[in-house]
C-alpha cells in the first residue's frame, strides 16, 4: 500500500528561513525528545510519517545545529490541527510536538547535518514545482482542445483523486 509522508520544515514566524528552526530534539539515550511546532504542512491530516528539520544544537552557525528526523505521526504527543483557508478548504495544517519520543535510529544521516540534506531535497522540489506549472499549462491547453473538438463532456468521466482535483477544475 501507499504511505503518506508530510514535510516538517516551516515554522511560525520563520518564513522561508529554514536556519531559524526552533523545534527541539534532545537526545536521551537511544531516543530523541521532540518539542515544537511546524506549520503549512500540506495534507498533514493524511500523513503517516513526517520528515522534520529539528534543532539538535545551538552551538556554531544556525545551519550547523539542524538534524533530519523521521517521526511517526501516530506517536503520543503529535497533534495535527487544520488551517482553514479563506475558501473554507483544508489542505494545510499545524503540527505540534509535545515531548514526542522518536527512536534515535530515525535520524537521517548524521546529527547536525540536516541543513545539507534539506538543501539537496529542496533543489529537487523546486525543479518539480516547475514541472507542475508546465503540467497546468498543458492541461489548460488540452481543455481548450477538448472543448473545441466537442469531447470535453466525455472527459468528466475520468476519476480524479480528491487532493489533486483543484488542479483540474
PLM region descriptions:
Residues 31, 35-81:
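A short core secondary-structure module
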Residues 149-152:
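Long, amphipathic alpha-helical stalk/connector segments used for oligomerization, subunit docking
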Residues 120-141:
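A conserved active-site cap/scaffold subdomain adjacent to cofactor or substrate pockets
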Residues 23-26:
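A structural signal for short hydrophobic beta-strand segments in well-ordered beta-sheet cores
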Residues 74-101:
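Flexible, small-/acidic-enriched active-site or ligand-binding loops
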Residues 100-114:
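Long, acidic (Asp/Glu-rich), low-complexity accessory segments flanking structured domains
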Amino acid at each position: 500500500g501507499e504511505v503518506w509522508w508530510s514535510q516538517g520544515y516551516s515554522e511560525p514566524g520563520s518564513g522561508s528561513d529554514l536556519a531559524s528552526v526552533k523545534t527541539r530534539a534532545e537526545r536521551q539515550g537511544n531516543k530523541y525528545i521532540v518539542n515544537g511546532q511546524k506549520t503549512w504542512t500540506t495534507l498533514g491530516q493524511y500523513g503517516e510519517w513526517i520528515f522534520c528539520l529539528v534543532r539538535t544544537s545551538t552551538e556554531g552557525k544556525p545551519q550547523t545545529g539542524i538534524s533530519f528526523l523521521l517521526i511517526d505521526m501516530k506517536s503520543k504527543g503529535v497533534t495535527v490541527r487544520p488551517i482553514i483557508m479563506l475558501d473554507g478548504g483544508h489542505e494545510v495544517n499545524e503540527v505540534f510536538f509535545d515531548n514526542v519520543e522518536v527512536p534515535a535510529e530515525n535520524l537521517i544521516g548524521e546529527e547536525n547535518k540536516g541543513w545539507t540534506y534539506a538543501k539537496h531535497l529542496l533543489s529537487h522540489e523546486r525543479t518539480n514545482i516547475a514541472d507542475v506549472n508546465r503540467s497546468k499549462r498543458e492541461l489548460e491547453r488540452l481543455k481548450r482542445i477538448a472543448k473545441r473538438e466537442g469531447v470535453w463532456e466525455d472527459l468528466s468521466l475520468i476519476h480524479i483523486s480528491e487532493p489533486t482535483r483543484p488542479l483540474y477544475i
